[in-house]
Amino acid sequence: MKILFDLGAKAFLRNFASTVSGLEARGHEVEQISSSNKAYPCSRFAVEDMENNMRLTRQVFYRSDSLASQSLLMRLARDYAWYSQPRLRRSEKCRERCRNMLEKGLPEEWQEDAATLSKILAGLDHGSRLAFSQALAVMEKHLPPDAQYVEFLRVRDPDLLVVTPLVFTQYGQYDMIKAAKHLGIPVIYAVYSWDNLTTKGVLHIAPDHVLVWNEVQKRELAELHDFPAENVTIVGAARFDDFFAMKPTPRNEFCAAYGLDPARPLIAYLGSWSFVAPDEAAFIRRLSDALKTSTNPQLAAASLVLKPHPKTIEQWNGSAVEQSGLAAICSSPQSNADQLLFDVIYHSFAAVGINTSAEIEAAIIGRPVFTVELPEFKESQDGSVHFSYLLRENGGPVEVAQSLEDLCAKLALAVAAGGASAGTPNFLETFLRPRGIGTPVAPIYVDEIERLVIALAPLKSRKTARNGAEHLAGTYAAKKNQTTQAKFEAKALRLEKARKDKAAEIIKNSPNPPQEAGRTTTCSDWWEKIRKNLTAGS
């Protein structure tokens, strides 16, 4: 079996390395493709080591036809509008991030149009934005595949295309899916992380099947992305397999390596991404001061040890340690299967974090995990759907403190208990390993991929589709020929005009969406503005 694994960027290789190795061990040919060399600083060496043992092709092209900018504008706008769904309306940071990308993520000649569309959308109520998002979804369905992607897949002729992470700016992967569907190649989307279906935008093009971590993600696909539940399989989170199997470094050895006193209690601070906690160093300083001035002698003597988020590792240097009051900063070239992260948590009596997947790893080890709700973190916590999944009140491992003083009180109880956690075995099984807490997930991924290749093959009329592909590939070759360039572009422009006209018709005939209380602007006013925007230049 020949499998093409579209990773989007090299950095995303790390969550599926064991799955790829498992497929190759069963004799399957696996080629990984990436459109970017991006790798987080602390995962760079791990990724390079994986590359040495796997076949990785860097495909650097993006959509090449006259619809390239229009399709990007359409997808950026739809991501922005998608956050008007009832469950996502508190996700203000994610919505504003999408708006900023809409205004700044296009070629210069399109930025004025993008800014205009952004202002129009920002002035609409939630219901109106959702209606516009639905019109964009119809436009997406009518967007033809790009010949360059079709040719890329036609030459390789895989039995299956697997894509990840797909959502959040990996728009080239959607064009890869379009090309695969045109050729009759089955497509599986492997969900990358715990937050991908709520913080990274909408699923613009439906794959044939999706592999998810748990029942929560299956519901998210149905409720937020309108994806049919019968095309979803729950497998678990393979990225934690090695972490479940790890053993700790001896305490004296670990402490000696970082200048820590093994006799003192340790507290692990698990760093968040800067998008979640922009000024995390200031909070760490406040926490450190609160611990040192605590009336509890064990807390006052405790060493606060930071394990930075992979994306912020370069922000922490010697001066940062001194200014933040940390006892040590522990960073390593690993991202997954991180022995240092395991040791930091294992040798601590508790872990503290704002909103990070490392809190999940603390639960795997069995340490108490705490967060604190402060005004500066409100949007990153209350405004994040996935954050609620980890809270103790919802069956998760994380206990919430209402203030810094409350956090210190909870830490005092934890140190008195010797770091024993109340335990969250149900969370670990339902959220990470739904097929059994003792069952590694990567082999399940391999089994399901093998099963789906067989199950999905009859759904495709491969012969008919590939006959059409030959015609499209010929068009691509003709495009490069100077004498046919004008004809190709003219046809593309006609297709684009037809697409805009269709979208304008949909908008014109759409019923007025629900209005929010207090709004006086009529729906017809903004429908007309958007209609003019879509048909401008036709």
What are these regions (language model features)?
Residues L153-R154, K311-I360, I365:
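Donor nucleotide-activated moiety binding/catalytic core segment of transferases
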